Amino acid sequence: MSINEVRYLPECGSTNAYVKEHFEEFGPVGAVYTTNQTAGRGRLGRTWVNAEGKALYYTVAIREPLAQPATLPLLASLAVRRQLSLRYGVECQIKWPNDLLLNGKKIVGILCEGVSYGYQQQGRGILCGIGINLAQPQSYFDAADLPHGTSLALQGANIDLTTDPEWLAEALTDFGFDRPMYVFARDGFAPFREEYKKACVNIGRRVTFDLPGGGEGSGEAVDIDEEGRLVVRTDSGEEHVFTGEVSVHGIYGAV
């Protein structure tokens, strides 16, 4: 598996939407990035606010078969974490499953989606969109109603907007996805599990999570299993959480 094309777009509505529209133009794996995304999706229905050149928006499109496609968001969070560490010397924490935090505030968001393509839409692929906050000022997060968001620049990183977006896009392509993807496509999440656990801020903390049948459960997050599920020890036993909202006490204002 190899990423065979990376497209730079001076501006687009959404890199995920662009990849969906042009999915069949890519080979087995392809990527698109921009620093001006004008019609992204705000979290929980919030209005999208364009960072106007101060953030990186990157989407990788995959139509190769994966052993565990549902765990791609976890691999993506590790891929970004590695490259931010190399470039800026920062050690982000991961809030399960795929938010990256720096000093307790969100610096990276990831959204993976399934795609149908080809004759009668019988082909199945997956795309993974990544937004990295590079140099937005505090006023951006205030206007976007994101009290728990931050940027690398606000956290003290030296950002060069003339070179950093391209460097990060190429690094994510070559070292974040291309090389690890050989292992991930064959073996799934298991080879990356220990690295992920060490970076996961949930482990050892009290969490609240959505129950499959409705309602909420709570307990201590104690592990990540080989399928990427968050293992929570509750009063009634262990729960293996894979979907739904998970609040971590002490993070994003959760108590």
List PLM regions with ranges.
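Basic side chains
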Residues: 41-46, 95, 197, 206
